């Protein structure tokens, strides 16, 4: 079952606020997960709005595969943040070993690229990452786009 909710605010809000949208729908939840889109982020990511942010969950092998592909294309890491995982007893969560949020610099060859050229690069790269992670069952790419 799909659940959709939205919060729009002129001031920054903590992402956990979005999880409150699920409260009224706890009964009958099919463990399919919950995802949300964040824009105009503050905190760790506030100073990197023009650079692509990769968000992914992966095994150790999946992380290595993704890093190899990104390096081969010419992306360089500017900043990486990993959330703390809270493994409480009783929760039916099968956590991946790595949850990664990386801000990346475009390849040097894209220094003077147009917006359309950069967007095409990001889409092609995300597809390449998703394909290899799916084939190896080693992770998921959630987003690869600037804020």
Where are the regions that the model predicts?
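N-terminal segments that mediate ammonia production and transfer
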Residues: 1-147
């Amino acid at each position: 079952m799909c659940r959709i909710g939205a919060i729009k605010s002129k001031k920054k809000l903590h992402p956990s606020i979005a999880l409150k949208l699920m409260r009224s729908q706890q009964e009958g939840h099919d463990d399919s997960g919950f995802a949300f889109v964040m824009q105009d982020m503050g905190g760790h990511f506030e100073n990197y709005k023009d650079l692509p942010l990769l968000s992914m969950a992966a095994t150790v092998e999946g992380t290595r595969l993704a890093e190899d592909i990104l390096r081969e294309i010419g992306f360089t890491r500017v900043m990486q943040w990993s959330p703390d995982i809270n493994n409480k007893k009783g929760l039916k969560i099968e956590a991946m070993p790595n949850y990664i949020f990386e801000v990346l610099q475009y390849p040097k060859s894209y220094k003077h690229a147009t917006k359309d050229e950069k967007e095409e690069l990001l889409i092609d790269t995300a597809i390449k990452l998703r394909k290899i992670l799916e084939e190896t069952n080693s992770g998921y790419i959630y987003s690869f786009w600037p804020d």
